[in-house]
Amino acid sequence: MYQINLAIAGIAVGTVSLPVLSKALKNKNLKKIAAIQNKSFELSLLLSVPASFGLIFASDQIVNALFGYGTFSAIDVEMTAIALKFFGYGVPAFALIKILSNFFFARNNTRTPFYISIFIVFLNISISLSLFSKIGYIIIPIATSISTWVGVIIYLYLLNLKKSLMLD
């Protein structure tokens, strides 16, 4: 369910901004680069933050409306709603990852996003495996959200380090 928000907030914005950003970088138009990065970042957050709040605060109602019948028990609804709530905390990060990776792709740098993605996956798996026996299924959405936010921080750090991030 959180993937719908990712598709709208991250993938759509990223797909539209990548060719424009690539062209601005090729032309070394710093004002346009900054404007594209700002708009991409802002639009992504504008779409993903409200979606995140919706998933966090209305997860019970969403899951109940979609699955609260048939063989899906009340306990199943409750457990799924809790998982959705924790995925909700990661929605802005899921969208930002797509935007931030495009800042590298536009510069013909595919290695850095690849290595960051590998790190995020290993971090996610490590957190999940190390805490699954203590916390249970709920660690999976928690680990996914945490590892993705760590990825966002890494992207921002590396872009800032290379003076490639031009946000207001």
Predicted regions mapped to residue ranges:
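Membrane-embedded alpha-helical bundles of multi-pass transporters/translocases
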Residues: M1-D168
